[in-house]
Amino acid sequence: MGLIARASRIRRSSGVSCEYYRLELQFVQLVESLGIPRAGFLFLTEERMFDLRFPFGIDTTTFYRMRVPTSLLSPGLPAEQWTTLFRQELTELQGYFSSHLFSTLRALHLYPFSAGSVRVYLVLFDTRTDVEEGALAADLHGDASGEERVRSFILAVQARFSFIEASRPVYPRQPELAPSCSQLEFALNNQRMANLFTISINQSALPPAVLQEELSMVRRCCALSNQLLTLVGNDNLASCVASRELRVVVFSSFPVDPELYLNQLTRGVSAYFVNHAENSLLITSSGTTRAQTDVLRFLQYETGETCR
């Protein structure tokens, strides 16, 4: 069964209607029409790194490794046309792939475009296991209908770019999320308290994976986690302690009801869910505290890590 047929069958059986899932299906249709199931987006960050986002068909090791500095991959490739980098041009990038993927890699095909002010490359991973020698490159560089399909998909991406942005890897205890001592002091002043919540993503309640189940679920859980981190906001704190689990600290003058808070978060991420969105997130309360050390331990940061 082809990828498109499989995706259509899953969609009919699950009643999926969310925007995130529709974008996944469109991506599956594009990569199958181009003859290769390994693709994603290289997203130019403020740190001048190309991060891999929204990947399909590759292994999770490559997903987490691929943060390529612009010193190794130029951000100035010609816009809205394909550039092919063959294997002999990619030796400096070997460390950003899994050993298995790089051993089969023949070329990367890059299609630069802009989403607002962000530079993005649609990337196809051309491996020996996917296509006949030379067939893919010929289609990309000489097929007008293929070019039109790519342009049409880019328009869909630009309309839903927040999904691409959110689908970055989640690392436990990300340093940039660690609170400072002064931040904790400010948050806990005037008799305010810290409400300690653990939020878990219920993977079984999410839509079925379309392509390569493990990566599809990892990618979706990362996107959800990053969207939740955004919703928590700068006035509160959060830490990813696992790929499907967040620790959240909500500061308030009174105890916050965990179920009401979960309902607020669920409404904010409903585009990722189908039907019974309330089953997709689970919440556990660990009570309240006014102690900075309790907050840090709950977030799984060492107490000396931020308050020095």
From Swiss-Prot:
Organism superkingdom: Bacteria
Protein name as annotated: Uncharacterized protein TP_0178
Organism: Treponema pallidum (strain Nichols)
